[in-house]
């Protein structure tokens, strides 16, 4: 089974492979999928609002937020402690929730109350503030991108130059910079 998987190259779909259903309200994608280590190396171009889960690569590379309808990211990967979520939403997409949507899941609620509908998680916000200060002091998002490319490439080079001892079956340009996934060619060793 491992040999079969090793021969199957995984990748993000190409732009021309994206099929948006007529009448679709939006296109959702996860910019960096952590289980298999697959990242979108491009931003999909579509004629509907683009919704992105950037939980695992938030603040790891420059992003033109004007190209998105909504971006959300759980802070626990790159921005702060678990329990804090960042949402960047285009104003024209607010106020469209179904009547059955709970108040706490309606982004319009947070916009109306400047993100303080309920007691803000002050400790989580404080930690995220410290992360932002550190990130800026280190050179900002472009520096984080440079570092993630450098670090991940060192690991991918070790995998690719292991004479088959390790393998990664992700197309090179779809390889995650945030989490490098690999296996051992010998399935018995994977079980240890």
Describe every region a protein language model picked out.
Residues 6-58:
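Active-site phosphate-binding strand-loop segment of PLP-dependent enzymes
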Residues 10-13, 37-42, 60-66, 82-85, ...:
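A short secondary-structure junction signal
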Residues 18-22, 42-45, 62-66, 77-81, ...:
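Solvent-exposed alpha-helices and their adjacent loops that cap or buttress functional pockets
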Residues 26, 70, 84-88, 179-181:
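Conserved hydrophobic/aromatic beta-strand scaffold that supports enzyme active sites
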Residues 51, 65-76:
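Conserved active-site segment immediately N-terminal to the catalytic lysine
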Residues 75-157, 171:
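Active-site C-terminal subdomain of aminotransferase-like
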Residues 167-192:
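Conserved PLP-binding catalytic core of the aspartate aminotransferase-like
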């Amino acid at each position: 089974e491992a040999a079969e998987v090793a021969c199957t190259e995984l990748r993000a779909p190409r732009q021309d492979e994206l099929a948006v259903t007529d009448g679709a309200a939006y296109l959702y994608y996860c910019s960096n999928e952590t289980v298999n280590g697959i990242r979108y190396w491009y931003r999909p171009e579509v004629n509907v609002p683009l919704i992105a889960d950037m939980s695992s690569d938030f603040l790891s590379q420059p992003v033109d937020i004007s190209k998105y309808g909504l971006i959300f990211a759980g802070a626990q990967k790159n921005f702060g402690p678990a329990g804090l979520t960042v949402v960047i939403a285009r104003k024209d997409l607010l106020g469209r929730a179904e009547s059955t949507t709970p108040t706490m899941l309606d982004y319009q609620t947070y916009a109306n109350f400047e993100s303080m509908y309920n007691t803000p998680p002050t400790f989580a916000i404080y930690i995220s503030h410290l992360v932002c200060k550190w990130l800026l002091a280190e050179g900002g998002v472009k520096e984080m991108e440079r570092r993630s490319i450098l670090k991940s490439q060192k690991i991918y080079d070790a995998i690719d130059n292991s004479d088959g001892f390790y393998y990664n079956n992700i197309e090179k340009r779809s390889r995650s910079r945030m989490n490098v996934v690999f296996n051992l060619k010998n399935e018995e060793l994977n079980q240890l």
